[in-house]
Amino acid sequence: MGLSDGEWQLVLNVWGKVEADIPSHGQEVLISLFKGHPETLEKFDKFKHLKSEDEMKASEELKKHGVTVLTALGGILKKKGHHEAELKPLAQSHATKHKIPVKYLEFISDAIVHVLQKKHPGDFGADAQGAMKKALELFRNDMAAKYKELGFQG
């Protein structure tokens, strides 16, 4: 299930584009997630009241959380699958405190791919998309395994 060196390079190349503007990428990913899967909003007390896309775009809190999410994910992706230390606290908080189901991690993975396709069509062709999907699946599978260890059936 691991990625080849070439696949990791494709992932990290496009991730460099994300890091050049994390706030707008993070905001777009969360808006895409909430629009595509409104039920996910219920897990976010500070965003539940945001009903329209305009309200979401105007929310500094949402933008800030998008930065947090993509910064954490970037740290994990840069470990090229050797992300045990980074994953453990994330799985702990998402399983025990936030109670985020694995399905929602799938939804946000789809949102990330969607936003990258939209914002970077020239740098995110079929090979890069395949590599990113594989990297995000590896992340989700490892999160699910940690959830299981923690007794969370998310």
From Swiss-Prot:
Pfam families: Globin. InterPro entries: Globin, Globin-like_sf, Myoglobin. It comes from the Eukaryota. Gene3D superfamilies: 6.10.140.2100, 6.10.140.2110. It catalyses: Fe(III)-heme b-[protein] + nitric oxide + H2O = Fe(II)-heme b-[protein] + nitrite + 2 H(+); H2O2 + AH2 = A + 2 H2O. Heme b binds at residue 94. O2 binds at residue 65. It is an enzyme of class 1 (oxidoreductase). Nitrite binds at residue 65. Keywords: Cytoplasm, Heme, Iron, Metal-binding, Muscle protein, Oxidoreductase, Oxygen transport, Phosphoprotein, Transport. One of its GO terms (biological process) is removal of superoxide radicals. Its EC number is 1.7.-.-, 1.11.1.-. CDD domains: Mb (cd08926). Residues 2-148 form the Globin domain. The modification Phosphoserine is found at residue 4. One of its GO terms (cellular component) is sarcoplasm. One of its GO terms (molecular function) is peroxidase activity. The modification Phosphothreonine is found at residue 68. It is found in: Cytoplasm, Sarcoplasm. Monomeric heme protein which primary function is to store oxygen and facilitate its diffusion within muscle tissues. Reversibly binds oxygen through a pentacoordinated heme iron and enables its timely and efficient release as needed during periods of heightened demand. Depending on the oxidative conditions of tissues and cells, and in addition to its ability to bind oxygen, it also has a nitrite reductase activity whereby it regulates the production of bioactive nitric oxide. Belongs to the globin family. Monomeric. Marmoset, woolly monkey, and squirrel monkey have a minor myoglobin component that appears to differ from each major component in having Phe-Lys preceding position 2. This is Myoglobin. It comes from Callithrix jacchus (White-tufted-ear marmoset).
